[in-house]
Amino acid sequence: MKVFEFVPEGIQDCRVTAWLHGNEEFLEMSAYTYQRPAMIVCPGGGYGMVSQREAEPVAKHYFAAGYNTFILWYSVGEMAKDFLPLRQLASTIAHVRNHAEEWYTIKDKIAVSGFSAGGHLACSLGTLFNEERFLKAFGRDDDIRPNAMVLSYPVITADEFAHQGSICNVSGSEVGTEDYKWFGLNEHVDAQTPPTFLWHTAEDTCVPVENSLKMATALSAAKVTFEMHILPEGQHGISVCNREVNTPFSYNSRWVEWSIKWLNKVFEFEV
């Protein structure tokens, strides 16, 4: 295992923690080092902070499943507007693809995972990667489309079911304005949106389940493959649903295994 941090090429004010399979000091082809898919984790926090509970506790599950894993520590608060977190995520996936050979990563099997506002960030990459408004702000022509998305109780809509604080932070606009509404991601889904895994709880009063339901409806209309699980119990922010993150929901914790099995199917990957 090799663990290190980097700042993606062409961006600033963020860092990425990388967990790579292979020799601790260098990676070389061997019986235990071969090309693998990758997962980029975007913790939540309302675009006001970055949750530790949705970072390493999540990443280690995908690493254990054989994925090269990355955690993005993106900009929040006043720095969350002007597409900065999304430019940071786009730069991260471009950086991973640029180093794919060196890191034994399969460049067309890179997924993004996000929780709550981090789910909005991950989903933004999957739905806005080809939007002229974002591309103008990004100013680069890198391959930034993720190959799959895993969205956990994500912030999606900018309507009556929106998590207003998240959308205000990322849009830099007041509730109900056109700029605010533009960040309703279900309105940007099209046939190029990547395959998506969604899960939410019916009891979530912070980010209502309608966010995932509307995303699923949009994916279905665009004929994008997806899998969705609505679990009956559990409030917002339960992460991997175990004692490590202080939300031990053994029933709900199954989402982790489900998402890995789904990704393995989409990526045709077996360890």
Give, region by region, the residue ranges found by the protein language model.
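N-terminal cap/lid segment of alpha/beta-hydrolase-fold proteins
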Residues: M1-Y34, Q164
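Mobile cap/lid helix-loop segments that gate and shape the active-site cleft of serine hydrolases
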Residues: P154-H188, P194
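Primarily recognizes the serine-hydrolase "nucleophile elbow" in alpha/beta-hydrolase
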Residues: A94-Q164, Y180
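Alpha/beta-hydrolase active-site loop
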Residues: A80-E102, R254-W255
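Conserved alpha/beta-hydrolase "acid-adjacent" motif
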Residues: T205-K214
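C-terminal catalytic histidine-bearing segment of alpha/beta-hydrolase fold enzymes
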Residues: L213, T217-V271
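Short beta-strand/loop motif that positions the catalytic acidic residue
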Residues: Q192, L198-H200, D204
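Short beta-strand element of the alpha/beta-hydrolase
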Residues: Q35-G44
